[in-house]
A protein has these predicted regions:
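Flexible helix-coil transition and linker loops at the boundaries of alpha-helical arrays
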Residues: 24-37, 76, 108-114, 227-231, ...
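"A position-specific structural signal for the A-helix of alpha-solenoid helical repeats
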Residues: 1, 7, 36-39, 43, ...
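Conserved structural position within tetratricopeptide repeats
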Residues: 23, 65-68, 109-112, 143-146, ...
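Structural motif corresponding to the intra-repeat A-B loop/turn of tetratricopeptide repeats
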Residues: 8, 51-53, 87, 131, ...
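TPR alpha-solenoid repeat register
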Residues: 76, 120, 154, 188, ...
Length: 383
């Protein structure tokens, strides 16, 4: 019911049903009704997984509880693998270098129980390729396409695999075919838009030989797919932010600004991953399109300080460094620019370097309490 209410747009009722499931779990501890518990945990987990991105970690926990009771359940094993696959970008910080993430192990386990699940095969292929296990990944892709070639979920992951490996034409072909079978998939529309965006960027990078006509062509195709994605799923904030940047490229700054303000207003609580991505893109809007360095710094800094090691964090750090270094090239005594470099170094874990930057910043602005406070904290950490 939670799932149905969510898709009917009745979010309050959807949340209410989720809470009722949790209440059932409290009333039915592990020692009672053993045959019911795994099903209840499983239903709760699938509901969380289908609600929104901000519930994925709860889905992981519910699937884990279901599997503690019924370890060989095919659906719970598959669901746990999918949930891990979707949440891993938030939880990989503690992995050793070259250590495989939990999703790879769980996808293998799920496929042992259901070896012909083409969706799981295609998901595992995407994940293995990210860890340079190309031979096994390609073998799984072939199996998935042979087992269930018309499944749009298979097509979208195969398309993602090709896009990640810069095989854009193959990815576009796969996603366009998937879209014919699943016209209302906001995810596939978004994936297709990302491919078109790569095409646009590739054409732009051919300067001075790039064709503005080609750039406009790919931009318009990208905009069309993103507009479809957000029409189908109005809560698709990341697609909205990508769309806003494209509107800005077309110099529709007012519409872009409206979209970013709406994204920030409607951001789900505790969704740090999405928040980081929105602030990075909003920073790009101010930096590249509005030429508003001060506002760009505000949003890049917000993205930087969110404690997730994602691509967007690296972009925020890189842009802040670029801004600070440019200012220092004009004025070596710019205390704010030095403090900005200190903030970036600190966020990246380079405490000694951060302390040095803040110390230099204080030499330029001796009464700045913010720099002094940061320097004191860093020195305490270092000793």
């Amino acid at each position: 019911m939670a799932w149905l209410k969510y898709h009917a747009g009745d979010f309050a009722q959807s949340q209410s049903y989720c809470q009722r499931v949790e209440d059932i779990l409290v009333k039915c501890p592990t020692g009672s009704s053993g045959s019911l518990l795994p099903e209840v945990y499983g239903e709760q987990a699938w509901t969380y997984l289908k609600l929104s991105k901000s519930y994925y970690l709860k889905a992981v926990e519910s699937f884990r509880k279901a599997l503690e009771i019924q370890t060989d359940d095919i659906e719970s094993n598959a669901g746990y693998a999918i949930a891990l696959f979707r949440t891993e970008e938030w939880v990989l910080e503690n992995l050793e270098e070259n250590e495989e993430p939990p999703s790879i192990k769980q996808l293998h386990s799920a496929l042992e129980l259901n070896p012909d699940d083409a969706v799981l095969q295609s998901m595992l292929a995407v994940k293995l390729a990210a860890y340079k296990k190309y031979e096994e990944a390609e073998g799984l892709l072939k199996k998935a396409l042979k087992t269930d070639p018309d499944n749009p979920h298979v097509s979208r992951y195969v398309g993602k695999y090709f896009r990640n490996h810069h095989q854009l034409d193959e990815s576009i072909d796969m996603l366009e075919r998937a879209l014919k079978r699943a016209t209302q998939s906001s995810f596939i529309h978004h994936q297709l838009a990302l491919c078109y965006m790569r095409k646009k960027i590739a054409e732009q990078s051919r300067k001075p030989f790039s064709s503005q006509r080609e750039v406009r062509y790919w931009r318009r195709r990208c905009i069309r797919e993103l507009e479809m994605a957000v029409k189908i799923k109005p809560t698709f904030h990341l697609a909205w932010a990508d769309l806003a940047l494209l509107y800005a490229e077309e110099r529709n700054f007012r519409r872009a600004e409206e979209i970013f303000q709406q994204c920030l207003l409607k951001l789900p609580e505790y969704d740090e991953s999405l928040s980081q991505a929105i602030h990075q893109r909003y920073g790009d809007f101010h930096y590249h399109h509005k030429r508003n360095e001060a506002q760009a710094i505000v949003h890049y800094t917000k993205g930087l300080l969110i404690p997730l090691k994602k691509y967007e964090k690296k972009v925020c750090a890189k842009k802040l460094k670029k801004i600070a270094e440019k200012r220092l090239s004009r004025n070596p005594g710019d205390g704010e620019a030095l403090a900005l470099l200190g903030q970036v170094a600190r966020a990246e874990g380079n405490r000694k370097e951060a302390a040095e930057f803040y110390e230099k910043g204080l030499n330029c602005d001796k009464d700045n309490e913010e720099y002094l406070s940061a320097l004191c904290e860093l020195r305490l950490d270092l000793h």
